[in-house]
């Protein structure tokens, strides 16, 4: 693993560790930590009226004043949730997806706060991504975007990043998505049709239009989908990869996963196994919302490490995959490969 990757991981972890601890049991109010440029962090208590990709609106406990804070100033949010919502989050964290889905759907039906409604939908998208159910994930994600076009939940956007040809049902749905007026719907449809022989040209044309969209999240994701197109056709150059890596480091955290996957594929095609592994490892280590994609990235990273002779690290990754992603296609492949490598390098 390169120093740059290690430094990036440390910065990412440090951001979380710096968050001030709140104890929600002390108050039924919502609690928010705000950090304005050049000032100390400021705790605010009250009722969150809305929380979008642009701003957080809060009615303070003291004075009942309405205050609005840019999303960029919001460090941490702790709110009270229903019992079903809390249980759903716990089940999701434990990987008990069927239980999580049941609890979260119950929470969805009883929740009347719009911004929390979006939070629950985002968790439901994660449940669907866990099992690779992109159709259900797409349905729930589009509900989020319909409520907030600039949502910060684009980290769960069920876009296609690999070069798999979609099945007939997915092609049908993706064409419907791409025909809608919503930029997010178009983006999702175009991403899944990029590998469909009959729709690839239309998909790429749509992505080029979206790459100039006024919504920066849509714009950046569409641009990374175009990187994917260049990579699949073998048109990407070393200069492209250098620019892409620099662009990724400037992106908001929630948008990086797919870009790192594409970068890893591009380095793999250009026979740069170490750099490919470094890019791919960002997914299982940090950006693992799409569990199926993270599993694939981890498997391919281990393959790349094996190519450069780092057998010990490759074996560790394959071994970890058996326990972490054992229920996925890539986890099963990892178990077979792990045993083969161990046997090949066993001491007589």
Regions flagged by a language model, labelled:
Residues 221-294, 298:
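Alpha-helical adaptor scaffolds
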Residues 103-105, 134-145, 168-181, 200-212, ...:
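Alpha-helical repeat scaffolds
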Residues 111, 148-149, 181, 214, ...:
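Alpha-helical junction/boundary sensor with strong preference for TPR arrays
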């Amino acid at each position: 693993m390169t120093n740059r990757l290690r430094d990036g991981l440390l910065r990412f972890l440090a951001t979380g560790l710096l968050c001030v601890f709140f104890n929600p049991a002390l108050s039924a109010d919502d609690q928010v930590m705000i950090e304005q440029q050049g000032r100390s962090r400021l705790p605010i208590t009250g009722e969150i009226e809305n929380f979008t990709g642009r701003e957080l609106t809060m009615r303070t406990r003291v004075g009942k004043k309405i205050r609005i804070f840019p999303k960029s100033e919001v460090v941490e949010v702790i709110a009270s949730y229903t019992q079903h919502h809390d249980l759903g989050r716990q089940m999701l964290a434990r990987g008990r997806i069927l239980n999580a889905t049941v609890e979260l759907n119950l929470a969805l039906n009883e929740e009347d706060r719009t911004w929390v409604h979006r939070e629950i939908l985002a968790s439901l998208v994660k449940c669907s991504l866990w099992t690779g159910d992109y159709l259900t994930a797409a349905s729930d994600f589009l509900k989020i975007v319909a409520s907030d076009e600039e949502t910060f939940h684009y980290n769960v956007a069920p876009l296609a990043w690999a070069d798999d040809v979609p099945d007939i049902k997915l092609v049908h749905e993706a064409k419907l998505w791409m025909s809608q007026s919503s930029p997010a719907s178009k983006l999702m449809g175009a991403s899944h049709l990029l590998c469909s022989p009959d729709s690839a040209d239309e998909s790429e044309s749509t992505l080029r239009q979206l790459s100039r969209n006024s919504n920066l999240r849509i714009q950046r994701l569409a641009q990374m989908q175009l990187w994917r197109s260049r990579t699949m056709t073998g048109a990407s150059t070393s200069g492209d990869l250098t620019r892409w890596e620099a662009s990724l480091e400037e992106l908001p955290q929630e948008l990086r996963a797919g870009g790192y996957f594409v970068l890893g594929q591009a380095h793999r095609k250009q026979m740069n196994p170490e750099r490919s592994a470094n890019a791919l490892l960002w997914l299982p280590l940090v950006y693992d919302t799409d569990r199926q994609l993270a599993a694939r990235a981890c498997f391919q990273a281990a393959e790349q490490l094996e190519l450069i002779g780092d057998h010990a690290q490759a074996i560790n990754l394959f071994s970890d995959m058996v326990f972490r992603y054992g229920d996925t296609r890539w986890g099963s492949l990892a178990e077979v490969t792990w045993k083969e490598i161990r046997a090949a390098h066993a001491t007589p």
